[in-house]
A protein has these predicted regions:
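Amphipathic alpha-helical scaffolding segments comprising HEAT/armadillo-like alpha-solenoid repeats
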Residues: 12-14, 39-53, 75-93, 111-124, ...
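Short inter-helical turns and helix N-cap capping residues of alpha-solenoid HEAT/ARM repeat scaffolds
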Residues: 57-58, 95-96, 127-128, 158-159, ...
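Conserved hydrophobic register position within alpha-solenoid helical repeats
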Residues: 65, 103, 135, 235, ...
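Alpha-solenoid repeat junctions
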Residues: 69-77, 107-112, 139, 143, ...
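Short beta-strand-turn/beta-hairpin segments enriched in glycine/proline and small hydrophobics
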Residues: 144, 152-168, 183-204, 224-225
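Short histidine-centered loop motifs in beta-beta connectors
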Residues: 163-177, 205-213
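A structural signal for short beta-strand/turn segments enriched in small hydrophobics and glycine
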Residues: 175-187, 213-222
Length: 283
């Protein structure tokens, strides 16, 4: 996969800049800032930070450490934050997706680090869709369009498959809102406890593909999730910088009235279309 190193031209415009460069690339991570009822507000000592970055640390402690380092970066404490950078790179292969997701978000905070750029090219191919999407957003900060397919995916419906074979029992109805980790359905496999199907992404239930009570096979499509407003908003800001003319039709579909998209998101879609057209024409 080739990395695009040249940053695309960004025409000036205060309204567009305000929409694009607000609190950049934050929304997608929000569901993981509070993990299992744990508030990551306690300031960690250097000793604790080092301990929590070890491979033997509890995943939520590692996430706590990553969030504190990201706060140091945001405050401009470069010397303090960079001392931990060598300990971050091994976390690219951490077994827990919440940790990899937070790591991708953190690496987007310091776009001067070549090591972070390289790590993000790995994370953008992660098995977890939320990790891939955060990595794609972070890559935009490096002027790298490698994550563009993921950004486009954030604008499109996501199909949920059954992780097990058995009798499907839906928990939600169509149009219900969904957060990351929301219980979507249960699959009765013959074991004492049914297998829980939880959402990997935020959004809302767009369509049920199988009748409730039907026997499904492992890997069978069961549900379609439409993207959340926050994910669409973030993707549009990323595509503002790296989008191409072939993306215009997908983006155009977001400019009309919708019960699930805020006016600012539809406006961002129009701005993104405008700047992609200008970029393609060399203006």
């Amino acid at each position: 996969m080739t990395t695009e190193k040249t940053k695309p031209h960004i025409p000036p415009g205060p309204k567009v800049k305000l929409l694009v460069f607000g609190v950049a690339f934050l929304m997608v991570l929000v569901p993981f800032l509070f993990w299992k009822g744990t508030w990551f507000g306690t300031v960690l000592s250097d000793q604790k930070l080092a301990e929590y970055l070890e491979s033997s640390a509890r995943p939520r402690d590692t996430q706590h450490a990553l969030l504190q380092i990201s706060e140091q970066i945001a405050r401009g404490e470069r010397e303090q934050s960079r001392r931990w950078y060598p300990s971050l790179l091994p976390l690219v292969t951490h077994p827990v997706p919440e940790v990899r997701n937070t790591l991708a978000w953190l690496m987007g905070q310091d776009a001067k680090q070549a090591e972070f750029h390289q790590a993000l090219t790995v994370l953008v191919k992660d098995s977890n869709p939320l990790v891939r999407r955060n990595a794609a957003l972070a890559l935009v900060r490096f002027g790298d369009a490698q994550g563009r397919p993921e950004l486009l995916g954030m604008l499109r419906p996501f199909t949920v498959v059954s992780p097990r074979a058995g009798v499907l029992r839906y928990r939600l109805k169509e149009d219900d809102s969904v957060d990351t980790g929301t219980l979507l359905a249960r699959v009765e496999t013959g074991e004492p406890e049914p297998f829980e199907v939880r959402s990997l992404l935020p959004g809302f239930v767009s369509e049920k593909l199988i009748e409730d009570g039907t026997t499904v096979t492992e890997g069978q499509n069961i549900l379609v999730l439409a993207p959340s407003d926050a994910q669409v908003w973030e993707a549009l800001r990323g595509l503002y910088l790296v989008g191409q003319t072939e993306d215009l039709e997908t983006i155009q579909n977001l400019t009309g009235r919708s019960t699930h998209l805020a006016e600012r998101t539809r406006q961002q879609a129009r701005f993104t279309i405008e700047v992609i057209k200008k970029r393609s024409s060399g203006v």
